[in-house]
Structure formats: C-alpha cells, structure tokens
A protein has these predicted regions:
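Feature marks short, highly hydrophobic, charge-poor N-terminal signal-anchor/signal peptide-like helices
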Residues: 1-15
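Core hydrophobic alpha-helical membrane-spanning segments
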Residues: 16-22, 106
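Transmembrane-cytosolic junction motif
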Residues: 20-46
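Charged, low-complexity intrinsically disordered regions
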Residues: 38-67, 72-210
Length: 210
C-alpha cells in the first residue's frame, strides 16, 4: 500500500496524468469546434451535413451542390477512398484519417493535373512562367499546357497564395480532388478551399481541348 501511495504521488506520475487530461480536453474541444465549423458551413452553403462510420469513429461529411457543381467534403480513412489511386500517388495505404474534397468536372478522358505547395531551395523549375507560382508550388499536368493556363487565370492566381502546406490537388478521371492528411478544424480555411477548388474546376473546364 505504501509503495502504491509513493507511486501515485510521484511528481512524474502526477505530471503525466495532468498532461493526459489536458491532451484529452484539447482533443474534445477541437472536435466540438470542428463540428460547429462544419455545421456553420452547411447552414451558409446549403450543403448537407452528416456523419459516416469509419474504422475509428463517426467522421463528418458535407455533400450536395455548391456553385452548380457536385461536391463532397469528407473525413475518411483508407477504406473510404480508392486505395489503388492513393497508393500510386502517395505510396501508402492511408491508415490515418484524411480530409478529402471532391468536385465533379466535365473534361475529356486523360486530362490530369497535380498541384501542391512546396519549399523550394535554389532555382525553381519553370512551369507557368510566373516566378512566385513556380517557386512555391510543385506542378505537373497532361497536357503540359494545362497547368500554366489554369494557374495563371485571374481567380485562381489571386487565391493560390492562401493554399497551405500539406494539401495535394489532383485532376483525374473527371474529378478534382483535394486531399490533406488529418482533419481540418478551421472553418474559414475550409470555406476558402471550397471557393478556390470551385474556381480551379471552372478554369480546368473552361480550357479548350483539341
């Protein structure tokens, strides 16, 4: 009994307990805040808020029509999305929770684009001809002319600097996909993403494909 009392009154043990309680409290508050942010977006945009069961717990989802386009914003784990595509793009099985935003687009078969923010040391690879865009973003597309045309369009170019590190954008198989590891709690950033990705989808669809 004395040894047990010594153990539970040990300063290191008490510090660990306090840390775990604070961590649990932070996670609960963050989850509640994220839920409020998503519900507010649903109220403002008309998107449908729901929860879907995953391997961990019920993750959130927004879906519906946004700016005349089918859109889905989903918190998901590996089995919630096409594993073959994600393995080829990221080299893993997505065992952690990701945030996906998917928009349907009307483009010819074989059209592809990939975009993500990077930290460039040294000279940047010239892709768009815009020094700031080429320096801060990794960009590829098929056909080659697609990315320069889309990323230098007025609406996309204006919003592009606000895109944060960690997000990957893909255009493939008549879908525009934004993917980021982890959950996004910042409601303002989520609203920005919805508008930016919609502008990007409009720009991709607006190109003339031979």
């Amino acid at each position: 009994m004395n040894k047990l009392l010594e153990y539970i009154t040990n300063p290191l043990f008490l510090a660990l307990i306090v840390f775990l309680v604070l961590l649990l409290t932070f996670n609960i508050l963050q989850r509640l805040g994220r839920g409020r942010a998503w519900k507010q977006i649903a109220a403002e945009t008309g998107l449908q808020f729901s929860k879907h069961r995953t391997a961990t717990y019920r993750d959130q989802q927004l879906s519906g029509i946004y700016r005349e386009r089918s859109l889905a914003l989903i918190e998901s784990v590996s089995e919630e999305y096409d594993a073959d595509r994600r393995r080829s793009e990221r080299g893993d099985n997505r065992t952690n929770t990701d945030t996906d935003i998917r928009l349907k687009i009307n483009v010819p078969q074989g059209i592809k684009m990939k975009l993500n923010r990077v930290i460039t040391i040294g000279e940047a690879t010239r892709v768009t001809g815009n020094a700031e865009i080429d320096r801060h973003f990794n960009i590829t597309s098929e056909p080659d002319w697609l990315a320069p045309k889309v990323l230098t369009s007025a609406n996309v170019r204006q919003k592009l600097p606000r895109l944060k590190m960690g997000g990957n954008i893909f255009v493939q198989e008549a879908e525009l996909l934004f993917n980021q590891l982890g959950r996004i709690s910042d409601g303002k950033y989520l609203r920005f993403l919805l508008d930016f990705l919609s502008d990007l989808a409009d720009a991709v669809e607006g190109c003339r494909y031979g």
